Design a protein with these regions (language model features):
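Bacterial Sec-dependent N-terminal signal peptides
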Residues: 2-5, 15-44
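N-terminal hydrophobic targeting/anchoring segments and the immediately downstream early-domain regions
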Residues: 34-108
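Substrate-binding cleft and catalytic face of glycoside hydrolase catalytic domains
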Residues: 48-53, 85-216, 220
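Structural recognition of the beta-strand scaffold that forms the well-ordered cores
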Residues: 57-67, 90-97, 120-125, 161-165, ...
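Noncatalytic carbohydrate-binding groove/subsite architecture in carbohydrate-active enzymes
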Residues: 177-270, 279
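Aromatic/acidic polysaccharide-binding cleft in carbohydrate-active enzymes
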Residues: 249-316, 323-331
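Carbohydrate-binding surface patches
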Residues: 328-366, 400
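C-terminal beta-strand-rich structural cap/linker in extracellular carbohydrate-active enzymes
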Residues: 386-408
């Protein structure tokens, strides 16, 4: 009778969002056998967060608006994309550098709006003007003219954070400019200082390490490169090692045939963002901001994908630093943690179909408690809060969900 009473008390505590660290392993083991409890405890270990162990600086989370192929974002869609209080909280906008200077001004309204919300704007060129190309290759004799074209664009739109001179130059048969890593390096070495904005490169199709390393072997190009960027089509995020540059993932989408409201697909994206951050990367940029499969749909609604992105973008702001954290402490649970001053933000992806109790330990920071925000198949950025005592606590993660903890 006493054992049953203890079990029932712990059940009540857990499902009330208990943050106590005093639940014993024996009690947890007993709970897992209780016929009315669906909480998962299998292979659960503590997620250890060391806020004193600093990793990469985070630049943000964002998406693309490409006017050559899609109508511009509306005012309402810009707010929903970039507002950290009422929208997704994107802090990066990616745009296309047009081949015609007559189209430069069309980019400016959304660029200005994104900047107004504090977002960084990065611009990628798919092609140089045709007069500067032979087929799908940039003429070496046109390097200076192409740099002047990029610089003119930067001036026309009021300045961007960085420019990529080539989009997926290693994607053979794409229809846009192709170039070897050596060729991209040669252009940046010769003209990277004349493009009007800092250079991001080489932006390969599949974040190809060999391509990136070959590009960076050009010491002059490397010195003129602000940060390395690339896309993860066909590639699982991975750590590029000590390349001496911040790494941005500047384009990807998971499935264009599935609605942005498909919950399983949204959870796939959640894990992908986790993987990018856990690989030491500084930024994650989705493909189209507004698309049926994107974070905002064609009817201007924030989708489930958008709310999943918001679990990162709203709370992990540019300038936050990722800190050491147990990445996969329990079966189906993935954790990253970030710090800004004394504030700690923890993002947890729970892939399990059952409520999962996850314990945490903290060092290097002593919060009094957390605001908890979570998104699952039925809730969007739901909120509650809890206090903690000491350097350890535990919480319930709702089934198939993304949870963000913000210290207070």
């Amino acid at each position: 009778m006493k054992t049953k009473l203890i079990q029932l008390l712990v059940v009540a505590a857990l499902f009330a969002g208990c943050t106590k660290s005093t639940i014993s392993e024996n009690e947890i083991s007993g709970l897992s056998k209780h016929p009315d409890v669906t909480t998962s405890f299998a292979t659960t270990a503590t997620a250890a967060i060391d806020a004193g162990s600093l990793q990469q600086s985070i630049q943000g989370f964002g998406g693309a608006s490409i006017l050559a192929w899609e109508a511009d974002l509306t005012s309402d869609q810009r707010t929903k994309a970039f507002s950290a209080s009422s929208g997704i909280g994107m802090s990066i906008l990616r745009v296309m550098v047009p081949t015609s200077s007559g189209s430069f001004a069309a980019e400016k309204p959304t660029i200005d709006a994104a900047k107004g919300f504090g977002a960084k704007v990065v611009a990628t060129a798919w092609n140089a003007p045709s007069s500067m190309m032979t087929g799908i290759h940039l003429n070496t004799s046109s390097y200076a003219a192409y740099a002047a074209h990029l610089s003119s664009y930067n001036t026309a739109v009021g300045g961007v954070y960085a420019i990529s001179p080539f989009n997926e130059p290693n994607y053979t048969g794409s229809g846009w400019m192709e170039a070897t890593a050596t060729e991209v390096g040669n252009f940046v070495a010769a003209q990277g200082s004349n493009c009007g904005a800092p250079i991001m490169a080489p932006e390969p199709f599949n974040m190809d390490q060999t391509y990136i390393n070959s590009y960076l072997s050009n010491a002059t190009a490397k010195s003129k490169t602000s940060f390395v960027c690339g896309h993860i089509y066909g590639k699982t995020p991975y750590n590029l090692g000590s390349i001496g540059k911040s790494v941005w993932m500047t384009e990807h989408y998971t499935n264009s045939s599935i609605s942005g409201d498909d919950w399983n697909n949204a959870m796939t994206a959640a894990k992908e963002i986790h993987d990018c951050m856990n690989s030491g990367w500084a930024a994650y940029v989705w493909w189209y901001i507004r698309r049926s499969y994107g974070p905002i749909d064609e009817s201007s609604n924030i989708t489930k994908l958008g709310y999943v992105m918001a679990q990162y973008a709203r709370y992990v702001r540019p300038g936050y630093t990722k800190v050491s954290c147990t990445a996969n402490p329990s079966t189906g649970v993935y954790v990253t943690a970030y710090k800004s001053g004394t504030q700690l933000v923890v993002v947890i992806v729970n892939q399990n179909s059952a409520t999962t109790y996850q314990p945490f330990s903290l060092s290097g920071v002593t919060p009094a408690g957390f605001d908890r925000y979570y998104t699952n198949s039925s809730s969007n950025i739901a909120h509650n809060s809890f206090t903690i005592t000491g350097s350890s606590f535990g919480i319930n993660l709702t089934p198939s969900s993304v949870t963000t903890l913000v210290s207070n």
